[in-house]
């Protein structure tokens, strides 16, 4: 549950999705391999052709995003960071799919995304994250996998009647 404690509940069990994401985004070899494999997307959408530039930008954004997410100051507001997954959605929904990313990044938009299910205002369950180099998540296997994972987690929460923080805490006590 996120309100500055992060974990993901999935049918396969609990793990710290946030730690996994940031470990990956700070692994230079993993980033090098990822950007080499996705250089066409990086060049066409972001106009970046140097893998080293992409790695540097990712490390910088990852650090900033981690600081924003883990900010435990009284003024911290996760609702300012997370936005509806669908850019066209403006209404509140039960267990809505959300995304977080760095806003107002110089030179180009941030490609880092953290995906979560919103339990209630200020309370999120992180389901994963990705480097999104295309306009939609459906265009690439790794982002489509995150989309499917979000839906699996959402369906799991619905099936187990975990629709708010209290129900989440009760569910964890039963494990």
Model-derived features with residue positions:
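Short, flexible active-site-adjacent loop segments at beta-strand->alpha-helix junctions, enriched
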Residues: 10, 120, 130
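Active-site beta-strand-loop-beta-strand hairpin of nuclease catalytic cores
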Residues: 118-126
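Short acidic loop-to-beta-strand element that houses the catalytic metal-binding Asp/Glu
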Residues: 113-116
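Short conserved catalytic/interaction loops centered on acidic-Pro-aromatic/His motifs
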Residues: 125-128, 135-136
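Basic, Lys/Arg-enriched alpha-helical interface segments
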Residues: 1-111, 133-135, 139-175
């Amino acid at each position: 549950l996120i309100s500055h404690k992060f974990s993901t509940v999935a049918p396969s069990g609990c793990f710290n999705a946030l730690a996994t994401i940031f470990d990956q985004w700070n692994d230079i070899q993993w980033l090098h391999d990822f950007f080499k494999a996705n250089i066409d997307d990086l060049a066409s959408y972001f106009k970046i052709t140097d893998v080293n530039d992409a790695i540097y930008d990712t490390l910088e954004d990852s650090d900033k995003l981690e600081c924003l997410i883990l900010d435990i100051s009284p003024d911290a507001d996760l609702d300012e960071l997370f936005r509806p997954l669908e850019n066209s959605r403006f209404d509140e929904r039960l267990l809505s799919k959300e995304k977080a990313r760095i806003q107002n990044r110089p030179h180009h938009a941030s490609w880092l995304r953290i995906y979560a299910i919103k339990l209630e205002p200020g309370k999120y369950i992180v389901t994963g994250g990705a480097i999104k180099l295309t306009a939609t998540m459906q265009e690439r296997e790794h982002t489509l996998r995150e989309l499917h994972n979000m839906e699996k987690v959402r369906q799991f929460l619905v099936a187990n009647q975990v629709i708010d923080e209290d129900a989440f805490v009760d569910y964890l006590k039963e494990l």
